[in-house]
Amino acid sequence: MFEVFSRGYYLGRLYVTPTDGDRALMHSEQHERINEEVYATGDGLERLDTPLVMKLETRHFPVHGADDVPTNTLALPESMLEGTSVRNPPSLQEVFLARRERARQLLALAGT
């Protein structure tokens, strides 16, 4: 789903669609699998519900898992879609996934 893009990011394509909620969501099983593959260190017990950090165009945001989101879909609040090039959702878009260290930096800056 995601491939290496740079030292700080992976690149993938997801269907981007609006949600009525107030946070970014993706299917919970995909969220856990990506969390395990990208963010887990393999040292002891690790949480797999830690938010993923993604970037659409110029905006970073934490992504949480939800059972009601279709697979291969990124559900974003309307406010996050404003000012983007997403038209007529669901729209297949390139999305960046921050690597583990970059995600930690971004979450620390956001106070999450």
Regions found by a protein language model. Give the residues of each.
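Long, compositionally biased stretches
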Residues: 1-112
